[in-house]
C-alpha cells in the first residue's frame, strides 16, 4: 500500500493523465474519409457547415474544428516540403 510521507503527496497534488485531460479522439475510417473529402473542397468551414458535418458524423463541433485546424497545419507542412523538394 502507498503511504503518504509528505503533504504534497495528497491527491490534490498527484497528477493523473486522466485528470483534466481529454482522451485522444479516434476517428473511424468513414469519419476520416468524410472529413478528408470535405477538406479537399473547403479548407475552412462555416459554422453552419461544421454543425452539419458534426451531426452527420456523430461528432461534436469542437472535434470538427480541431480536426480541420490540425489538417490545415499538415497541409501547410506538406506543401512546404514539396516546394523544397522541387528546388
UniProtKB/Swiss-Prot annotation:
PROSITE patterns (UniProt xref): ANTENNAPEDIA, HOMEOBOX_1, HOMEOBOX_2
Domain of life: Eukaryota
Keywords for this protein: Developmental protein, DNA-binding, Homeobox, Nucleus, Transcription, Transcription regulation
GO MF term list: DNA-binding transcription factor activity, RNA polymerase II-specific; RNA polymerase II cis-regulatory region sequence-specific DNA binding
SUPFAM superfamilies according to UniProt: Homeodomain-like (SSF46689)
GO biological process: anterior/posterior pattern specification
DNA-binding region in chain numbering: 20-79
CDD domains: homeodomain (cd00086)
Annotated motif Antp-type hexapeptide, positions: 5-10
Transcription is among the record's keywords: yes
KW DNA-binding (keyword) present: yes
SMART domains registered for this protein in UniProt: HOX
A Pfam short name: Homeodomain
Subcellular location(s) per record: Nucleus
Residue ranges the record marks as coiled coil: none
Cellular-component GO terms for this entry: nucleus
Similarity annotation: Belongs to the Antp homeobox family.
Function: Sequence-specific transcription factor which is part of a developmental regulatory system that provides cells with specific positional identities on the anterior-posterior axis.
Stated name of the protein: Homeobox protein Hox-C5
Amino acid at each position: 500500500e502507498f503511504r503518504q510521507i509528505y503533504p504534497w503527496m495528497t491527491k490534490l497534488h498527484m497528477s493523473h493523465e486522466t485528470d483534466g485531460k481529454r482522451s485522444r479522439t479516434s476517428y473511424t475510417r468513414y469519419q476520416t474519409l468524410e472529413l478528408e473529402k470535405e477538406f479537399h473542397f473547403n479548407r475552412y468551414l462555416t459554422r453552419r457547415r461544421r454543425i452539419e458535418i458534426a451531426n452527420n458524423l456523430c461528432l461534436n463541433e469542437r472535434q470538427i474544428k480541431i480536426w480541420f485546424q490540425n489538417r490545415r497545419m499538415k497541409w501547410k507542412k506538406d506543401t512546404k516540403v514539396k516546394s523544397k523538394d522541387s528546388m
